[in-house]
């Protein structure tokens, strides 16, 4: 069933919406913002009570369709665990806006595949949102990545857990950009790729939260990650006692590699990349680092034009063009035993979970579910679709072209998202990142399936060689390459003389030279 979410504010006139699907109504007491949660009241199925709600995202805040973080609360304002729309009880939830994913299935598909591979992944329910009586389109109501028995099932840490076995876990970590709300540290091992936005691999401790994290706990988890990364890069990295197998849960890293490479996620490995560390067992075993859960796949499955994501015959782990990829992925792939484990697991999954039949069935079920609401969604956001002629032109083979490097045919961030239109500068966040465009929802589903078939064919051919003659391409550490940490401060004063490929910049480049505001590249959407 497709649920309908209704969001209204006290200061606004409420409109009655007639719908055959379930409604979730939220009444906010103040204007929503991304800094702090606003108190609101929500009715969602059997749940009715107070919540906290805030906007979420970075550059996606500029999108017409916003994303939201929800926290269920009791009357005193304390967070309370409650089931929503049939999903297990918890206090923390997310309304993901699939604005730059016309299929609206990429995040749910990624989460579903990860769960079917045997790991915890966020459960989702498709909903529609009405804000202050105005239709806001189709949303994904998702579990947030949090510690809990029905989420990431980690040992609950107390502030007194500062030594011995108690300090060993559990921890929830993320590799991403810097976030002042988290306790962060920087990897001592340089990442690989071009890394034009940053040269650093930044680890954040998500659980325990920064306000609860004790100095001894932070020191422990930082030292553990440092030791793990040093061991993987060391001369004894294959040794079962001194090498990487002593620190990581190898099976989870194998699955994470397969899952990420199938998706060719532009953010893969380097942004919204979660890990968790379990508490050591009494007998001294366990306590290893697990890869996952997976998160943030709106720029995956052929839906982006940078970080190798526009090249269906490329490896995702090599696509560190914006943020660097952690070097340990390249190093793990140098181990014949790790590659053999990948091949064995991949061939097993191809017979079931990763078969075209299984994946297509999930996509078709999802498309059937949202189909009755797509007309409303695209009426609200007509910019998501283009003419059949433009769609056809954009769907030509999209391997990275010689001479454009990471920019591919669409330019960095799709330079096709920038244009002069009637002579005025325009910013199109959809075209900015899109690897292709479509003229209808049905066409999007068809293109997505074709992309998946082609991607699986590439993986079939190359992973078959993993225990034979295949070796990863060794890339230099990103610190040895040219960096633009703050973007290109002056932009491209002269632009591309002939305009950018795929219809991006007009001849002569940006008016006034550079990006809007002179701030370099805009931030990327979708993180956290």
Located regions from the model:
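Hydrophobic h-region of N-terminal signal peptides that target proteins for export
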Residues: 2-9
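N-terminal module-boundary/linker segments of secreted carbohydrate-active enzymes
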Residues: 12-45
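Short, flexible loop/turn elements at secondary-structure junctions
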Residues: 28-30, 55-57, 74, 97-99, ...
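Conserved oxyanion/phosphate-binding beta-strand-loop segments in alpha/beta enzyme cores
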Residues: 42-97, 214-219
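Middle-to-C-terminal accessory/interaction subdomains
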Residues: 59, 63-64, 183, 199-270, ...
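Structural recognition of the beta-strand scaffold that forms the well-ordered cores
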Residues: 68-71, 91-97, 104, 128, ...
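Internal "kinase-insert"/substrate-recognition segments embedded within catalytic cores
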Residues: 74-77, 90, 97, 118-120, ...
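A conserved helix-loop-beta module that forms one wall/lid of the active-site cleft
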Residues: 98-132
């Amino acid at each position: 069933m497709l649920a309908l979410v209704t969001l209204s504010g006290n200061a606004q006139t409420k409109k009655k919406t007639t719908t055959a699907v379930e409604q979730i109504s939220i009444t906010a007491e103040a204007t929503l913002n991304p800094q702090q949660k606003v108190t609101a009241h929500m009715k969602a199925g059997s749940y009715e009570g107070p919540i906290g709600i805030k906007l979420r995202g970075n550059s996606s805040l500029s999108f017409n369709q916003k994303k939201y973080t929800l926290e269920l609360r009791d009357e005193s304002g304390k967070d309370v665990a409650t089931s929503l729309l049939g999903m297990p009880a918890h206090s923390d939830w997310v309304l993901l806006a699939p604005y730059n994913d016309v299929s609206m299935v990429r995040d749910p598909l990624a989460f579903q595949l990860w769960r079917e591979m045997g790991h915890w992944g966020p459960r989702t329910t498709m909903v529609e949102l009405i804000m202050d009586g105005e239709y806001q389109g189709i949303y994904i109501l998702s579990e947030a990545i949090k510690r809990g028995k029905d989420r990431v099932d980690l040992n609950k840490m107390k502030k007194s857990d500062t030594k011995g076995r108690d300090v060993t876990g559990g921890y929830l970590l993320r590799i991403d950009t810097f976030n002042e709300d988290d306790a962060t540290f920087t990897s001592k091992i340089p990442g690989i790729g071009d890394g034009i936005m940053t040269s650093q691999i930044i680890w954040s401790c998500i659980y325990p939260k920064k306000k609860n994290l004790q100095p001894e706990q932070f020191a422990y988890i930082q030292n553990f990650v440092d030791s793990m990364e040093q061991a993987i890069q060391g001369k004894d990295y294959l040794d079962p006692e001194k090498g990487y197998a002593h620190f990581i849960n190898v099976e989870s890293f194998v699955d994470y590699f397969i899952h990420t490479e199938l998706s060719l996620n532009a953010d893969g490995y380097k942004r919204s990349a979660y890990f968790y560390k379990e508490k050591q067992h009494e007998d001294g075993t366990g306590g290893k680092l697990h890869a996952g859960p997976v998160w943030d796949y709106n720029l995956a499955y052929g839906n982006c034009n940078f970080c190798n994501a526009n090249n269906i015959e490329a490896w995702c782990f090599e696509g560190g063009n914006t943020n660097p990829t952690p070097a340990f992925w390249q190093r793990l792939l140098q181990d014949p035993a790790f590659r053999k484990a990948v091949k064995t697991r991949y061939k097993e999954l191809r017979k079931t979970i990763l078969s075209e039949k299984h994946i297509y069935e999930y996509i078709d079920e999802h498309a059937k579910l949202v189909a009755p609401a797509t007309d409303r969604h695209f009426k609200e956001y007509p910019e998501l679709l283009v003419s059949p002629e433009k769609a056809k032109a954009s769907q030509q083979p999209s391997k990275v072209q010689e001479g454009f490097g990471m920019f591919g045919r669409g330019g960095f961030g799709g330079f096709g998202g920038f244009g002069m239109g009637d002579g005025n500068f325009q910013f199109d966040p959809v075209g900015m990142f899109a690897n292709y465009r479509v003229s209808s929802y049905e066409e999007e589903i068809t293109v997505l399936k074709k992309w998946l078939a082609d991607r699986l064919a590439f993986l079939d051919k190359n992973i078959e060689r993993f225990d034979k003659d295949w070796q990863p391409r060794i890339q230099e550490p990103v610190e040895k390459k040219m960096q633009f940490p703050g973007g290109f401060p002056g932009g491209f004063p002269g632009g591309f003389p002939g305009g950018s490929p795929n219809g991006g910049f007009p001849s002569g480049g940006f008016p006034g030279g550079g990006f809007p505001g002179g701030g370099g590249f805009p931030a990327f959407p979708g993180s956290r």
